[in-house]
Swiss-Prot record:
The gene is IGHV3-53. SMART domains: IGv. One of its GO terms (cellular component) is plasma membrane. This is Immunoglobulin heavy variable 3-53. Disulfide bonds join 41-114.
Length: 116
């Protein structure tokens, strides 16, 4: 059986210019279809739970694609392409945003951004 191996990169951006705002990302890795990966985005300089936070991605040679959002009240929404496979969440005590990605596909290969 043939497997596709793809790199998933993780970086972060903060919308607008604000002093002392930092997003530190971990979790990118080498995966294969059907695998799982969790991306983390640790924030400082603002409170994750008081803002809406999004994940977006950019596949090679393509434009930005919105993936998911979590609002301050906890409501979550997903792009149709990831619904049922990806889960956005946050840990308020760690001020960290997460994206749990399951049942990964070759087309999920992209640069992933967390954004405020």
């Amino acid at each position: 059986m043939e497997f596709w191996l793809s790199w998933v990169f993780l970086v972060a951006i903060s919308k607008g210019v604000q002093c002392e705002v930092q997003l530190v990302e971990t979790g990118g890795g080498l995966i294969q279809p059907g695998g799982s990966l969790r991306l983390s985005c640790a924030a400082s300089g603002f409170t994750v739970s008081s803002n809406y936070m999004s994940w977006v991605r950019q596949a090679p040679g393509k434009g930005l694609e919105w993936v998911s959002v979590i609002y301050s009240g906890g409501s979550t929404y997903y792009a149709d392409s990831v619904k049922g496979r990806f889960t956005i969440s946050r840990d308020n005590s760690k001020n960290t945003l997460y994206l749990q990605m399951n049942s990964l596909r070759a087309e999920d290969t992209a640069v992933y951004y967390c954004a405020r």
